[in-house]
Structures are given as C-alpha cells and as structure tokens.
From Swiss-Prot:
EC number: 6.3.5.7
Similarity section: Belongs to the amidase family. GatA subfamily.
Stated name of the protein: Glutamyl-tRNA(Gln) amidotransferase subunit A
Function according to Swiss-Prot or TrEMBL: Allows the formation of correctly charged Gln-tRNA(Gln) through the transamidation of misacylated Glu-tRNA(Gln) in organisms which lack glutaminyl-tRNA synthetase. The reaction takes place in the presence of glutamine and ATP through an activated gamma-phospho-Glu-tRNA(Gln).
Organism: Chlamydia pneumoniae
GO MF annotations, alphabetized: ATP binding; glutaminyl-tRNA synthase (glutamine-hydrolyzing) activity
Lineage summary: Bacteria, Pseudomonadati, Chlamydiota, Chlamydiia, Chlamydiales
Length: 492
C-alpha cells in the first residue's frame, strides 16, 4: 500500500476499497519499521491521525462526499503551524512552542480530508542544505543512509522517498524543496511567489519564502496545488493566479521551445551534464526546439541571495528574544542577559552566522555597500529572466551540481552555500520551478531536472514536468531501483 500515490489512495478510500483508518495504520507501521534509520520526523501524532481517519470513514458510511485528499497521509515541515502539534523549526528556541492556529495550507488539507501524520525534520529555521543543522537529530538519505537528504526540507523529501507518506509539505527560500527532492529522487515544486499562502509559515526571508509540495509523482504535486493554492485574505502577498485546476492541465504535450543557459552550466561534472542533456534530448525527440539563452548574471545570484536572505532573516528572527515566547535562559538575571543568553544558547551556529551577516549588511555603514546594491542586482536578475522568456516558453537547468554528498563531506559554509547555484535565482525572480527525477549519477544516486516558468505559469511548469516524467518513463525507472534499498524495500 505504501507504494500507492496520493491520487490512488484517495480514490480507493472514496470508493470504499480501503478505509482511511487502514491506510493511516499502514503508514504508521511503515514509519515504525524504518524511521529509526532515516530520522525524517521531529514529532508524530498517531492518536490524532487515527481519530481523523475514523471521522473520514464515518463520513463515508453516512454517504457524505469526501474531499480530494480522502484518507491521504501528509507530512508537514516543522516550520508550518498545525494546531495540537509543536512548531519547533528544528530549534531549541521554539522547542516547546505550540501554535494556537493552523497554517492556511494545513487548514485546506484538513478541509479536503487529508490526514496529518506529524512534523518533519529540517535545518534550523530553514537555514541550510543538509538537514544536519537540526537541533534534534540529522536526517539520512533513504537511497544511501551515509549521505545527506539535502535541505532545508530534508525531512519532507526523505519521508516521501522512504514512503512514510505519499505527499509532504516543504518550504523553499533558495532551493529548499527542489534540492532535497533531487537528492532523494522525488518531485519537488516551488510555486510562484504568492501562489500559495504563507500564513502560518515561520518566516525566514519573507520576500523569498514559498510553501510547496513534495511527492513521488507530478500528478500528486498537481493534486496538492489544487488543494491549497490560491488567494488567502490572511496573506496580503497571495494571489489568485489559476482559473482551472492543475490536474486538468496535465498532458504529455511538450513545449515548442525550451531555453538553456549553456554558459551558466560550465563546470558541471560529466555524469551530471550527460544526464541533463540526455533529459533534454527526450523533449527534442518529441519535437521541442532548444535555444541558448543569456543568463550569465546568475553567476552573482548566490552572493545576492545570501545578502538579502540573511538581512531578512536577521529582521524576522529578532522577535525570538526570550521575552514573549520561545527559549528563555535560566542564567539570565538582567534584561541584557535575557536577550544575549536566550539567543546565544537557543540558536545554532548556522542561524547565528546568518543573523550576524544580516545585521552587518543592514548596518548604517554597510547598507549602501551591500544591501541596496544587492536589491538592485536582484531587479536585474528579474529583467534577465524576462528577456530570456521572450525566446522560449520554459527554461531548463540541473537542480544541483552534484548528487547527494556524504554526511560530513562538506563542512565549509561557503562551499555549502554554493550548492544553491542553480536554485536561488528562481526565488529572487519570484518564478515557479519543479524538480523532477531524471536518472542516476555514476554512484547510482538520484539526479533531478529543473523546469522553470514565468511567474504565474505554475500549471505550465507542472504540465511540462509531467510530460517529461511520462516520456522518460521516470516512474518505471525509479520503481526498479526502490527494491534494491534496505530502507525502500520490504513488504507492500
């Protein structure tokens, strides 16, 4: 049963072929079987999940219509609020914080009869690309337990990859959905800025953050977008981009023209380059024309991103001061000590590094030198993408410059930041982008193809991702490999 997609599970529960209670019990058994190896979750809510499943089964027995996610288990990244569960952001600062409300996306999932299984591990406050910066425990890649799952939504990607849940929610500020999706061999979608409400998401960088789904198929990503995309009066940045459903737009039609920034791809490892261009050859075989596009300005994207994201993070995290809520140092006896010790003891090293960088670039002496210049370059990146889209419908890039690396292999922060080279620009430019599994590296690890569209063209991006998935027979390719893994094998 754990190999079923969300669509298949919802259909089976709606038709009475499966019960929501049976589905929920099955996935908790799966979690109990392998979670000790993977470490995808921070907290589980088995009792509440089974109560919700029972209500769904009773609803069906009364002949009432069920929602789009009838009985579908969902994992939630632990920076998204769920009533009754702690929102820790994988930080000691919020270790005991329990929100009094649901995030809008969670509210909409519950309304469609989805079942929340628990909260998923992440890099602290979503700052990182390994999920090793969690204050609680690391998460391991289900394809190779000695390797990272990516981050910051590493728990979400690992949970979907290990089949602990068919779908999960993550957040993407600079690649935090797409990179772990590629590392763990699943589909990850970063919607356009404003396409999904951020109400109930603990902010990292408010002009960059976006909630999105991770799943084993593009169809399930489309299903989740149908459930929770759209305008929300509680989030002034949210917009109503879509008139029709995502599911109705899925087809195997290929785009007429795909743009490729070839000069930006120099230096790729041979097997990564070969996989990327062989993926594009599948589109060419179906009639797509590839054109070169000029996006050399993206070589500055990582620098610009870390200036702007850190500045916004420093501002957003200023509220965690030990006064109103969150961790309060027992050693503090004065107001000054309360601020200094609570934050110094509560935040991890990476979060403190970003806060320091953010406060530095926002200081009176440095704001013009760094922050304002970075804002100006961001505007140029937005313009460069607009120019590129005049030549093509869709852009394509790799998701990452390497497959998942070993835990402890990369320790230098700057080297880790450079892992984001192919993902941060889409956040800076507010664009939708999907990571779809595309094959395997020379080590046998998953790789991903990234498909990018114009802001508001999320449905086209998902449709092209679906087209690639079907023409490349990705589901069949990856299902053959699952059985060979200790974590991914077992009884169905």
């Amino acid at each position: 049963m754990y190999r079923y997609s969300a669509l298949e599970l919802a259909k089976a529960v709606t038709l009475g072929e499966l019960t929501a209670t049976g589905v929920t019990q099955h996935f908790f058994h799966r979690i109990e079987e392998a979670e000790g190896q993977v470490g995808a979750f921070i907290s589980l809510c088995k009792e509440q999940a089974l109560e919700q499943a029972e209500l769904i089964d009773k609803k069906r027995s009364r002949g009432e219509p069920l929602g789009k996610l009838a009985g579908v288990p969902v994992g939630i990244k632990d920076n998204i609020h769920v009533t009754g569960l702690k929102t820790t952001c994988a930080s000691r600062v919020l270790e005991n914080y329990q929100p009094p409300f649901d995030a809008t996306v969670v509210e909409r999932i519950k309304k469609e009869d989805g079942i929340i299984l628990g909260k998923l591990n992440m890099d602290e406050f979503a700052m990182g690309s390994t999920t090793l910066y969690s204050a609680f425990h690391p998460t391991h890649n289900p394809w190779d337990l000695s390797r990272v799952p990516g981050g910051s939504s590493g728990g979400s990607a690992a949970a979907v990859s290990a089949r602990f849940c068919p779908v999960a929610l993550g957040s993407d500020t600079g690649g935090s959905i797409r990179q772990p999706a590629a590392f763990c061999g699943v589909v990850g979608f970063k919607p356009s800025y404003g396409a999904v409400s951020r109400y109930g998401l603990v902010a990292f960088a408010s002009s960059l953050d976006q909630i999105g789904p991770l799943a084993n198929t593009v169809e399930d990503v489309a299903l989740m977008m149908d459930v929770f995309s759209g305008r929300d009066p509680k989030d002034a940045t949210s917009r109503e981009f879509f008139r029709d459903s995502f599911m109705s737009k899925l087809s195997t039609e290929v785009p007429k023209v795909i743009g490729v920034p070839r000069t930006f791809l120099e230096g790729l490892r041979d097997d990564i380059r070969e996989n990327f261009f062989s993926s594009l050859a599948i589109f060419e075989g179906e009639g797509t024309h590839l054109v070169d596009v000029e996006l050399d300005i993206l070589s500055h994207a990582v620098s610009i991103y870390y200036i702007l994201a850190s500045a916004e993070a420093a501002t957003n995290l200023a509220r965690f001061d030990g006064v109103r809520y969150g961790y309060r140092s027992p050693q503090a006896h004065t107001i000054s000590q309360l601020y200094d010790l609570s934050r110094g003891e509560g935040f991890g090293k990476e979060v403190m590094r970003r806060i320091l960088l953010g406060n530095y670039v926002l200081s009176a002496e440095r704001q013009n030198v760094y922050y304002k210049k970075a804002t100006a370059v961001r505007a140029k990146i937005v313009k460069a993408f607009r120019t590129a889209f005049e030549k093509c419908e869709i852009l394509a890039m790799p998701v990452c410059s390497s497959p998942a690396f070993e835990i402890g292999e990369i320790l230098d922060p700057v080297t880790l930041y450079l892992q984001d080279i192919y993902t941060v620009a889409m956040n800076l430019a507010y664009l939708p982008a999907i990571a779809v599994p595309s094959g395997f590296s020379k080590e046998g690890l998953p790789l991903g193809l990234q498909i990018i569209g114009q802001q508001g063209q999320d449905q086209q991006v998902c449709q092209v991702g679906y087209s690639f998935q079907e023409h490349a027979q990705i589901k069949q390719l990856f299902s053959k490999r699952y059985a060979k893994s200790v974590v991914l094998g077992g009884q169905s």
